[in-house]
Amino acid sequence: MEGGALAFGHGRMKAFSVRGRGKVKRRGPAGGRSSLHTRDGGERCPLRRTGKYGKGKDMLFSASRRTDIPTYYSEWLCNRLEAGNVCVRHDARRVTRYVFSREAVDCLVLWTKNPLPLLDRLALLRGWPCVFQFTLTGYRRDVEPGLPDKLQLVEAMKRLSEAFGSERVIWRYDPIFFSGAYSLSWHVRCFDALTERLEGVTRTCVVSFLDMYPKLRRRIPALGLCGDSGQARKGLLAA
């Protein structure tokens, strides 16, 4: 699988990934006409109405683990959908243009903590094979200061489920960490409360624990986090 990261705005932020075995690459002199080629063959690759870049070459657009595009760039995303193409900046000189159309894309995966800015534009997404990776926890504003009230987000998830189906809305309860304010028992109570509100809204829930990278470990005293506790993890998963 080939991958890429999209640069948009002024080219300083990378926020988009494109995955597929038939990576489409723009070639040609600057200012001249360019044609679309596949990296693995170098031959012109016509788009098929099956949504494939050639036989067996699925195209997945994932937007994105690097930033919350539905929250901050929903207008940009919809503009790209209407334009039918998107440019990917790999470095200062190299830019790849991808076809961004319903016929070419097999799945559009949107990662978000707050889809509210996108809800008024859902009509543009109808007909697209969308999957939403929706992160929703009970952390308060000391951890997630930029989010709306959690009950608003529950209602937003319900709207996505009604529009696209419960199987296309994946609930992510992550990352899980433990501190004085967020204990094992707190997570159990919070998770139970959310599952009651989200009954029938989603069919899948993903949980994961905070990765304790060296840089984060140095900040643990300031953040008030407890050390990585295998016992606490087992207790939460067994609850």
Task: Mark where each language-model region is.
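Conserved C-terminal portion of the radical SAM core fold
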Residues: 152-219
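Extreme N-terminal basic, low-complexity initiation segments
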Residues: 2-8
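Serine residues within intrinsically disordered or low-complexity segments
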Residues: 17, 34-35
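Surface-exposed cleft-lining segments at the edges of enzyme active sites
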Residues: 140-147, 175-185, 221-233
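A conserved mid-domain beta-alpha-beta active-site/ligand-binding segment of alpha/beta enzyme cores
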Residues: 233-239
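Conserved Radical SAM active-site core
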Residues: 37-144, 150-166
